[in-house]
């Protein structure tokens, strides 16, 4: 009988947290559990790490009892760091959507490295980890001085399970201001402003370490099973495609819609349009453009149920109903825009859903043009389940759009790092592009309006 190899993946997004159990033999999903995340008040808005730990332990314990678990892989959202002293936190883990005090913001802007060094744009709130750390260092000097390790979020959870502290490039390269992607080393912010001794030795996202006996007691797992160092979630989506020979673009969706292109010359890197270089699991810079698509959709369709029909989309095109960028200000390819509707107002739920679908497709097309358009577009995450969106995107770009058939590209990529295995990703056939009268003119008008909003 073949040896069992069940991999549990802790997939911690900004909005939701999941633990997925995958069969390492064929990467099929065995089980999964999901829960919403919460942000707590206090010194500043911070993540509920205690609740996240309980959720992780409960899921792992349940999976061990029902199916057996042979290894744990970790992937989380970026722009988050934990300050660790001993086996606890020196300070709560700051929520990156917290709007930093203006005085801190202005002071940090004079200290951060230039874009051509970090390929990291200045982003609002705490989306640059460097800004978070500067805030904590200057506002809470006593607590900050106790810090032994600064850990990016995947590595914090690996630390909780293995007791070992590491730095890792995919999370450091996620618009932190802390990393030089082209050089593969820390930026001058580390050492000049932030003590270098607080950043532990580098490890690869695929490096594995044994589960401690303490963590084994908490999770019900066997001590010593392998746990990965952890990877930034968008980069986990790239892992199955890293050895693909064809130029392609990955659209990873969730709270953020993130476009990354492999083997494609990018457009000019424009810090003013939320472009950056992510770092893939092999340590290579990856041109990236993104916007807060999941958050946009949530705000635009609040109270709506279902999905848009093609007839509803055709009606929106015919009536000239437009959603402008900037519902979430300060991010995306139009960071100065302030959102709103243009043209005729939507009538009812159906037109809201249809307008939102067109908006997401047009914003994704814009990001693809910035990051570099591949010969194929692969959809991962919630947008992969939105057929009208996929068909509109194919029509707008003129490029074949495929929906990933994997249960979750993020979880699959994280599992592959532990398995040290290649994988032929499962794709369905290319979607059929929509053929809607007026779509091209509608898109042209939307782009003109969006440029005016810049």
Residue positions per predicted region:
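N-terminal glycine/serine-rich phosphate-binding loop of ATP-dependent small-molecule kinases
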Residues: 1-93, 103, 146, 217, ...
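Short, acidic/turn-prone active-site loops that include or flank metal/cofactor-
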Residues: 34-40, 94-102, 173, 255-257, ...
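Hinge/lid segment of periplasmic solute-binding proteins
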Residues: 99-113
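Active-site core segments that coordinate phosphate-bearing ligands/cofactors
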Residues: 8-9, 109-123, 128-166, 177-192, ...
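Short loop/turn motifs at secondary-structure junctions
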Residues: 68, 195-198, 373
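A conserved helix-loop-beta module that forms one wall/lid of the active-site cleft
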Residues: 192-207
């Amino acid at each position: 009988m073949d040896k069992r190899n069940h991999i549990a993946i802790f997939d911690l997004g900004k909005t939701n947290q999941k633990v997925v159990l995958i069969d390492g033999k064929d990467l099929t999903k065995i089980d999964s559990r999901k829960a919403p995340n919460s942000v707590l008040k206090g010194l500043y808005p911070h993540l509920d790490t205690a609740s996240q730990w309980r959720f992780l332990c409960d899921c792992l314990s349940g999976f061990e009892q029902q199916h057996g678990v042979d290894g744990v892989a970790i992937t989380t959202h970026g722009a988050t760091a934990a300050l660790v002293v001993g086996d606890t936190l020196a300070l709560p883990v700051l929520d990156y959507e917290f709007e930093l005090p203006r005085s801190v913001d202005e002071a940090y802007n004079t200290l951060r490295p230039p874009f051509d060094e970090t390929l990291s744009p200045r982003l609002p709130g705490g989306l640059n980890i460097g800004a978070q750390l500067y805030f904590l260092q200057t506002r809470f000097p006593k607590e900050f001085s106790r810090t032994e390790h600064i850990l990016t979020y995947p590595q914090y959870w690996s630390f909780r399970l293995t007791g070992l502290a590491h730095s890792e490039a995919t999370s450091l390269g996620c618009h932190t201001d802390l990393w030089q992607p082209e050089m593969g080393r820390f930026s001058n912010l580390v050492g000049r402003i932030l003590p270098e001794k607080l950043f532990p030795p580098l490890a690869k996202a695929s490096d594995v370490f044994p589960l401690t006996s303490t963590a084994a007691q908490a999770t019900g797992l066997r001590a010593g099973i392998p746990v990965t160092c952890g990877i930034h979630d968008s980069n986990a989506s790239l892992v199955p495609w890293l050895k693909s020979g064809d130029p392609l673009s990955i659209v990873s969706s969730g709270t953020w819609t993130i476009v990354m292109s492999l083997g494609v010359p990018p457009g000019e890197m424009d810090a003013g349009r939320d472009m950056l270089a992510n770092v893939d699991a092999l340590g290579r810079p990856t041109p990236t453009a993104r916007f807060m698509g999941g958050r946009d959709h949530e705000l635009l369709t609040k109270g709506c149920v279902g999905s848009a029909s093609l007839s509803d989309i055709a009606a929106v095109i015919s009536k000239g109903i437009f959603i402008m960028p900037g519902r979430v200000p300060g991010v995306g390819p139009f960071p100065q825009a302030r959102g709103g509707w243009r043209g005729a107002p939507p009538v009812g739920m159906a037109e809201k859903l249809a307008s939102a679908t067109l908006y997401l497709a047009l914003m994704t097309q814009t990001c693809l043009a910035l990051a570099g358009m591949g010969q194929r577009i692969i959809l991962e995450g919630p947008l992969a389940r939105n057929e009208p969106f996929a068909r509109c995107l194919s029509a707008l770009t003129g490029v074949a759009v495929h929906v990933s058939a994997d249960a979750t590209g993020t979880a699959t990529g994280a599992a592959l790092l532990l398995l040290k295995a290649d994988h032929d990703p499962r794709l369905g056939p290319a979607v059929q592009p929509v053929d809607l009268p007026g779509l091209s003119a509608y898109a042209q008008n939307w782009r003109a309006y969006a440029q005016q909003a810049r």
